[in-house]
């Protein structure tokens, strides 16, 4: 476990250096930052980073996944990030639209570009390099580079603190499955290169889903993996209701160790949209508590 933590720390340093080089190049691009006053964000974590760098007053609209902080819910909605409507966006007269490669559809983005909207497609891969590049790009575009560095520093410090706590735990990594209810058919499971996979590993768990991205697995396939802990994610239900929704489409999971031992953890779905967000360190601590209940004080130790 200690070797794993040291490796993570080295990755943090390498990603920071590479992202700094990216930021230097990115700062020379785009609209004159001094005059940007109207911004739209599509992607929950992206919106949270805009708030973290002090740009909330520049936001004139957000997508439906942008629910944190709660104050964003008072802003006009431009719909779901994958299904933006040009008219709805242009009505808000934005100068810049921040999003990821999940943002679309492409014809709408082209229409927005033609109308003079600066489209900023940020990297949202689930790693420290991508989040560093994204936050620094936000800072460069909005003339908030100093605030971006401060927000990144706080985020990395939070991750480092959780890594130090994890290094104190002497125990086998629990077998974990993150299951995302889609309301119909087999639920999705979070595999590699997802925020869910990153969270599981940062909290000291073993992700049983080895496929790339999100993939639907049959009820029997998930039972064969026999997770010790199940993280449930549901846009419409919370807690036991979320588990019941998942079991209604994957009934075999009721025989898994996780369900039999009541080791079910609910996760806010907005954490999984738009890359790594600023709230993740606190959720790593919560998952660590759930993964290692025999060490109840470790995740919260100052």
Q: Model segments located where?
A:
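Short helices/loops that flank or line small-molecule/ion binding pockets
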Residues: 86-93, 218-229
